[in-house]
């Protein structure tokens, strides 16, 4: 309850410690002045990292030597951390973003680590960041070849990967305990007619990184056809869409437009924001004022981006009689994976990928998670011109190119959509009831109904406002429509 202010002002981070209780000593007789040092390390780590990566105007509110129970009662080094004001719009634009969560959690860890290093005179090593540019393909011996790249931490020179753990999962089972390797490439045997999945973690003396996305392969033993390449293009996590009125009197998050993408799952979501007037004060918990939300999701753990979609698509590909491999979107910059001589088709998973901001526009970061970046556009163009076949699925395949409210549309992007993928934007927020149907077309004469997740749930990320798209070529045709209004859902 640190308060709310207008504009883009950040209330920021406060640390609280106690140095005077128990005659100023811990149980072992050492000075409680160490609490000050711990607090300073953690606050410095948080504020430096946030200012460098996201928001140069992030406020360090200071440190209080105060008799808060949680600060004075422990007889070991302790501090209280008030990271931000959950009432303040400018703070919470960052506070709702999973990337911010990761950075701050890592900052706290680094602050504690450096405090212990100072206390005991040891050198420290920070655990590595997750690897990127992951790819899982099959070689001529029908073995899987895994490759990836380490990621250096610009904020911490000790956080370099020394080794890696390769985790494997067969079918719908659990991941094994992992195999340690020293290089950024690994070859393994895989059983046929099973979806086999992998994830990578980096290792050093400081510990183990967060895992990579999950990529999968499958060998259809009876198939003589070329395999299908699956591109895992959905790597977005982020806060909900937000707005601020021109007069600054209203601001908040737009759950019906895009409620954000949690990292794997979210336990803290209670419901949509319903009070946007910034002047409305808190009265009591039944009239919570600005930022008040519904409570209909208090008991639900909301699913976000699991980073595990090639396995899901691969099950269907394998069932259809094709082998498949998968690569990350970033890996397309390293190798010409989209090769019509090697793959019978390419399945591009985009999910809720779209150009998104972090907090205040113009702070440090630009826009991340473009659905079709230049590398992908070129790879798809070359593949299609060589006779390749492409299947693309995603909520914002047109809006991100034609009508993203954050970014000016580029003529080259629109030309790519129209001339290579043969579709055009018709509408955003095209449907809300979660149902589509097939229509008579060269694809199929069969009538079928399908559903998608249109509300927060425990099974899948939610699709709040999918696109309507129309053919942009005389040879193209509509094959799906939204059941509620007949707007075109697929081309």
Identify the residue ranges that each predicted region occupies.
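A glycine-rich, often tryptophan-bearing local segment used as a flexible ligand/cofactor-contacting loop or short
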Residues: 353-465, 471-477, 483-484
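Pro/Thr/Ser/Gly-rich low-complexity, intrinsically disordered linker/stalk tracts
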Residues: 115-158, 206-225
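Active-site-adjacent mobile loop/cap segments within catalytic or ligand-binding domains
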Residues: 3-6, 54-121
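Helical hinge/lid and interdomain linker segments adjacent to catalytic or ligand-binding clefts
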Residues: 266-409
């Amino acid at each position: 309850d640190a308060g709310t202010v207008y504009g883009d002002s950040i209330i920021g981070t406060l640390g609280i410690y106690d140095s005077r209780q128990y005659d100023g000593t811990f149980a072992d007789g050492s000075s409680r002045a160490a609490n000050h040092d711990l607090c300073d390390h953690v606050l410095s780590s948080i504020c430096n990292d946030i200012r460098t990566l996201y928001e140069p105007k992030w406020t360090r509110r200071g440190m209080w030597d105060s008799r808060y129970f949680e600060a004075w009662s422990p007889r070991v080094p302790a501090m209280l951390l008030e990271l931000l004001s959950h009432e303040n719009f400018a703070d919470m634009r960052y506070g709702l973003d999973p990337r911010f969560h990761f950075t701050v959690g890592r900052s706290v860890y680094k602050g504690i680590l450096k405090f212990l290093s100072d206390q005991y005179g040891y050198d420290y090593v920070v655990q590595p960041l997750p690897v990127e540019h992951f790819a899982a393909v099959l070689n001529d011996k029908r073995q899987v070849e895994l490759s990836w790249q380490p990621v250096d931490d610009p904020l911490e020179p000790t956080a370099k990967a020394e080794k890696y753990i390769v985790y494997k999962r067969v079918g719908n089972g659990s991941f094994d305990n992992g195999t340690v390797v020293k290089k950024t490439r690994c070859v393994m045997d895989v059983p046929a007619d099973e979806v086999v999945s992998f994830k990578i973690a980096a290792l050093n003396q400081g510990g183990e990184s967060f895992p990579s996305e999950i990529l999968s392969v499958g060998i259809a033993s009876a198939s003589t056809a070329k395999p299908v390449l699956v591109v895992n293009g959905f790597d977005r996590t982020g806060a909900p869409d937000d707005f601020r009125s021109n007069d600054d009197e209203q601001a908040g998050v737009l759950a019906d437009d895009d409620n954000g993408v949690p990292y794997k799952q979210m336990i803290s979501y209670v419901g949509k924001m319903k009070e946007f007037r910034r002047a409305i004060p808190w009265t009591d918990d039944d009239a919570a004022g600005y930022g008040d939300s519904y409570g209909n999701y208090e008991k639900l753990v909301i699913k976000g981006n699991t980073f595990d979609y090639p396995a899901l698509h691969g099950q269907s590909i394998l069932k259809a009689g094709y082998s498949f491999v998968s690569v990350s979107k970033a890996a397309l910059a390293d190798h010409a994976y989209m090769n019509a001589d090697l793959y019978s088709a390419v399945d591009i998973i985009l999910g809720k990928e779209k150009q998104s901001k972090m907090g205040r526009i113009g702070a440090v970061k630009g826009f991340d998670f473009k659905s079709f970046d230049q590398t992908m556009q070129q790879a798809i163009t070359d593949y299609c011109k060589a006779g390749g076949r492409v299947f693309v699925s995603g909520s914002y395949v047109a809006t991100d190119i034609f009508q993203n409210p954050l970014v000016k549309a580029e003529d080259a992007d629109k030309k790519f959509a129209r001339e290579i993928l043969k579709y055009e934007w018709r509408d955003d927020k095209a449907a809300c009831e979660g149902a589509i149907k097939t229509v008579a077309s060269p694809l199929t004469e069969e009538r079928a109904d399908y559903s998608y997740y249109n509300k927060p749930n425990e099974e899948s990320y939610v699709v709040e406002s999918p696109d309507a798209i129309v053919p942009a070529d005389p040879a193209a045709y509509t094959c799906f429509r939204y059941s509620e209004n007949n707007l075109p859902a697929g081309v």
